[in-house]
Amino acid sequence: MNKRKHMDIRRLIISLPAIMALWGGLASCDKMIYDNYDDCPRGVYVNFYSQTECAENPSYPAEVARLNVYAFDKDGILRSANVFEDVQLSAAKEWLIPLEKDGLYTIFAWGNIDDHYNIGEIKIGETTKQQVLMRLKQDGKWATNIDGTTLWYATSPVVELKNMEDGADQYIHTRANLREYTNRVTVSVDSLPHPENYEIKLASSNGSYRFDGTVAKADSTYYPGETKVVGDSTCRAFFTTLKLESGHENTLSVTHKPTGREIFRTDLVGAILSSQYAQNINLRCINDFDIRLVAHHCNCPDDTYVVVQIWINGWLIHSYEIEL
């Protein structure tokens, strides 16, 4: 009896290396197990980080909690679509994007797409990277309120899955830089005798995005932002917007409510870029804008006020001469 037990244990010990070798072969697509590599699972591991041109080191934003990740081939056709929940970015963490075939791929990723957005139809093997991925929800001309949320976008360098028959790796690794696609904009108007009579608005045609992070053509949409009186001669409004960039009608306006007359209207991004101090306000590095407009009484037909100075993040970017 004991002799048989010893024999069974010995057989088990002898067979363990064989079992481990078999498991390792299955896990790594060993040629000893597979006749070829056609059924071998493959893919790209992606590490996500965030770093602007102005930052010395990468960061790993804690507010990124969800990732929608897409892989497109060299022809711009979608080959893999994945959603990862409860994300926690770190230098060591990677996410696997499964792929079936050898070839060149680019990874596009969006962080924090939620129920504020409508997602377009997605079909593996048909959808192109130039198609619209999502649209910010809106009611008429007003966008849904995205205060307290952030949106992020990343793209990887082109990566290549090579033929494993030639000794290539089963999986490859890359990184993708998440850039924030939301802005927080505080606008104050000073030197108004009756600040309760004025309304601040901010609109942009940036509510739709393609898979590749570019803005799709859309009508201008107003972002919610209540104008409040914050002093004897000051009113203020706060807005959370999607990415403000040149060419998309980023219109900031101030209206005198009793008459309906606009006392100020400008393309916000255009005003920044046309300023001699534009180099101090790098739109690639800044997501928070503190805008101060200084008003002055003018010799106008309706005896009202106009804006004579524009300050952004402490910089006087424009001043205007008026007839007093």
From Swiss-Prot:
Example of a GO biological process term: pilus assembly
Lipoprotein found in the keyword field: yes
S-diacylglycerol cysteine-type lipidated residues: C29
Main location: membrane
InterPro entries to which the protein is assigned, alphabetical: FimB/Mfa2/Mfa3 (IPR014941)
Superkingdom: Bacteria
Cross-referenced PROSITE patterns: PROKAR_LIPOPROTEIN
Cleavable signal peptide: 1-28
Lipid bilayer topology: Lipid-anchor
Keywords, in A-Z order: Cell outer membrane, Lipoprotein, Membrane, Palmitate, Signal, Virulence
Lipid attachment points (N-palmitoyl cysteine): C29
Subcellular locations according to the entry: Cell outer membrane
One GO CC annotation: cell outer membrane
A UniProt-annotated Pfam family: Mfa2
Effect of deleting the gene: Minor fimbriae are longer than normal and are easily detached from the cell by mild shear stress.
Post-translational modification remark: Palmitoylated. Palmitoylation is important for export to the outer membrane.
Purpose of the protein: Anchoring subunit of the minor fimbriae. Regulates fimbrial length. These filamentous pili are attached to the cell surface; they mediate biofilm formation, adhesion onto host cells and onto other bacteria that are part of the oral microbiome. Fimbriae of P.gingivalis are major virulence factors.
Note: The name (minor fimbrium subunit) does not indicate the abundance of the protein, but is derived from the greater length of the major fimbriae. In strain ATCC 33277 and strain ATCC BAA-1703 / FDC 381, major fimbriae are 300 - 1600 nM in length and about 5 nm in diameter. In contrast, minor fimbriae are only about 80 - 120 nm long. This length difference is observed only in a small number of strains, including strain ATCC 33277 and strain ATCC BAA-1703 / FDC 381, and is due to a loss of function mutation in FimB, a protein that restricts fimbrial length in other strains.
Subunit structure: Mfa2 is not part of the fimbrium itself, but anchors the fimbrium in the outer membrane via its interaction with Mfa1. Linear, head-to-tail oligomerization of fimbrial subunits mediates assembly of the fimbrium stalk, while the minor components Mfa3, Mfa4 and Mfa5 probably form the fimbrium tip. The anchoring subunit Mfa2 limits fimbrium length and is important for solid fimbrium attachment to the outer membrane. In its absence, the minor fimbriae become very long and are easily detached from the membrane.
Family per similarity comment: Belongs to the bacteroidetes fimbrillin superfamily. FimB/Mfa2 family.
Record's protein name: Minor fimbrium anchoring subunit Mfa2
Organism of provenance: Porphyromonas gingivalis (strain ATCC 33277 / DSM 20709 / CIP 103683 / JCM 12257 / NCTC 11834 / 2561)
UniProt gene name: mfa2
